[in-house]
Amino acid sequence: MKIQLLSFAALKDFFPPKQELTIDGIQTVLDLKKHLQNQKPEASHLIKVSRISINQIIANDSDSITEGSTVAILPPSSGG
């Protein structure tokens, strides 16, 4: 299955800001998080605390990812 993966803020240090990703065997947000943590163990904590959106809707870990989705990884941020 192919998706568009968008990375923001500190996650851009580990992943390209935008990439097409082939993710066979991945069905849920939690599956994707685990896959990305295995790819970049040094980003594991940041991925764990990040929110995920699918087609601009915030998703839960149990939500399904479908072919052609745009998935964004949104790390926590702070500001003033």
Which residue ranges define each predicted feature?
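Ubiquitin-like/PB1-type beta-grasp interaction modules and other compact soluble beta-rich domains
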Residues: 1-78
